[in-house]
Amino acid sequence: LGIKVLYITPLRALNRDLLERLQWWCNNLDIKLAVRHGDTETRERTRQARSPPDILITTPETLQAILPGWIMRQHLRGIRWVIIDEVHEMADSKRGSQLSLALERLRLIVGRDFQIIGLSATIGTPEKVAKFLVGNDREVEIVRVPVARHMKLKVMFPQPTSIDNELASRLYTHPEVAARLRIIRELIEKHQSILLFTNTRAISEVLASRFKVWDVDFPVSIHHGSLAKTSRIAAERGLKDGALKGLVCTSSLELGIDVGRIDLVVQYMSPRQVTRLIQRVGRSGHRIGRIAKGVIITMDSDDTLEAMVIARRALKEELEPVIVPHKPYDALAHQIAGLILKKRRLYFYEIYDIFRKAYPYADLTIEDIEKVLRYMHERFPRLAWVSFEDMVALKPRRTKALFEYYFGNLSMIPDEKQYLVVDETSDSPVGILDEAFMAEYGKPGTKFIIRGSPWKIIHVYGEKVYVKPVDDPTGAIPSWIGEEIPVPFEVAREVGWIRSVVEEKMKQGKKPEEIALELAHEYPADKEDILRSLNETIEQISRKQPVPTDKRITVEDWEDFVIIHAHFGSLTNRALAQLIGHVLSEQTGYTVAVQHDPYRIFVQTMGITTSKEIIELLNKLAGMPEITIRETLTRATVKTGLFKRRLIHVARRFGAIKKWVDFSSVSLKSLVKSFEGTAIYDEALKETFTKDLDVKHLIQILRELKEGKIELLKLENEGKGSPIARIGIERVSMKTDLIPPERMRLILIESAKARLLNEVRAITCVDCWNYVEMVRIKDLPDNPKCPRCGSNALGILEEEEESLLSIMEKKGEKLTKSEKKLMDK
């Protein structure tokens, strides 16, 4: 009796997919199977309560929702197996921490232990994830399947040709971009089905629209999380059925959603992390004995060297370690609320005994529990009534706030707001900026690129960002930067190591071609592409100038900037940039703007500092004790928009701020003042230091600098910028992303036209009610008619075919509320 197997997946789309795949087996083996998530209809939920399935497929959030329910708790008592799919997606996030606590609550309900099975394609530290899966002090077995033997990778750095110049003018773009598109198109035409992964939604939209402007009938579509469900399902089916040859996608298709057989995976630009590359390329060759094939198309020298390093590491299975969040307080508060819902009186030691068995909370203390309960007790309305003398938490008399908090915060995924960008001169909308971008850069005076043009933020009001166009793009930040995946410390250092090898071998008298050939034996790329990616390095060495490496930081002046070349990755460089910016601001009294990428830091000097002074500052930082570095960085961090964003996310998860509260309307000072000394403040700081900054490696490189293991050199260039600096300057001046306004207008018109023509809608006849079909807008005739009765009375809905079948059966009469709502669309 009751549910025997609980199958937990990170995505609703995976639930739908699993249901389709398991249905046949379950029907033939007489096993009851059901899916439950946020969109499950009331009728289906009632059916599950009356007659529980043997296997329940669900998400972590829905498990949270059913744990307090009296009837479902009875059904959960029969559980013998819990399967967690795509476990790597959970382990390094707060969703995973929350799930690990929920599984401890589930053990309380079941009254005995059950077997947990975790499934994942790519894990950097299997032992850690295994412990995360089963909890502390429980036995676990790891079954490894080697991936490298079954994977073939190649890095390509396309060179523009005369054909690309012609194509560039047709597509209103640059020859370099046209060359990349041409290579991708050739790959798509040579294969049956391809997944084309990008790192951000913005880039996937641009790529898909460029293909459609090139050829509206080209069988490629787009797939990402922001698309309507119907468009996503139509794209998945199109690839599965062979109507499409390729899908441009983001991480939405990284996980195991079934899109049929994939011959090849193309990664547009460096995947930035080894695990991501393996996960993405692993989507191809999904048959026993088949090889997974992947091609990485790169855009510049940094991108190519980075992709080469990541590809080599993937083939050698040198994956990034999984970082499990350290006893997050927000997940703990939510799970304590879940316990209080079912038990009127809870002693601190009871909470401690239950939750310390979960791996992220292995070193949980009574003080941690007290800190979280103090907030729950002191807030209004209370989430718990706590006696700190007796060390006991009681359910509050009025439980409305407790229920609202628990069921309103089932998800640990932060609600990211979006901001409308408005041109102040014409009051017309320009585009959208996300919360991540606004947190780090959303201040008046910031220059950024959106829709191919540079703009300057004038002021932010509510959810609108008022801007005006500017002529000089130097220092402008691309609007999609908030979405970018951080490059790990180890990857960036290996890029620096390649540059040091080239320098060493050239000093020994070797020719660049010979060096490129040697590197081609180590890295999966052609000699010619490797040689092109080393152009700037070779040029700098030929000028008798030192190049930045894994063991050398170089500093130089360029126009209004000081450039610090540091091969230490995104999070270490961000921490170093923040530290430099803060110390310089304290010294000069001016706000110093800093930008960073995985290989360099740009300090906008405004004439107040030089490369010589930056070198002195770096040496001063290297001489600081570790505790002083941490304290200085903490002081710097709490003043940033990044910290404000994390603080708001944590406060929302604690129920301290309503989900709709506007990010920009809350002053950072008042926020910090409100939460200082609370569990919310501590957790926000912890999250910032885990997700946004890499303090461990920052301290390591400063120590190596002090010990002389890393050298620090000034480059003399008369302010012109060294060859390697040019790569960063190209990015910071955004030359390749700028498009003249008149060409931009043509691009937007053509892109919108192509996108609308490729939308898929459900067409249904409201006369005979016997016809429903998913049709691409482009394929509709000028005068569409019902093929069954010839009527012109056709309705067009943004829904799936299946969801309209019940309406068809009823001939549009005696509809339920949800069916009427659907028809009114």
Predicted segments with their positions:
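Short beta-strand-centered aromatic/proline hotspots
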Residues: 453-460
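Helicase motor core with emphasis on the C-terminal RecA-like subdomain
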Residues: 2-396
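Short amphipathic alpha-helical interface segments
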Residues: 334-346, 417-426, 818-825
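A contiguous, basic/glycine-rich beta-loop/short-helix subdomain that forms a polymer-engagement track
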Residues: 125, 169-170, 174-179, 384-439
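Extended, highly charged accessory segments
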Residues: 352-355, 359-418, 478-479, 483-825
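Loop/turn positions that initiate beta-strands
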Residues: 443-446, 450-451
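Short, solvent-exposed secondary-structure boundary/capping segments
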Residues: 461-478
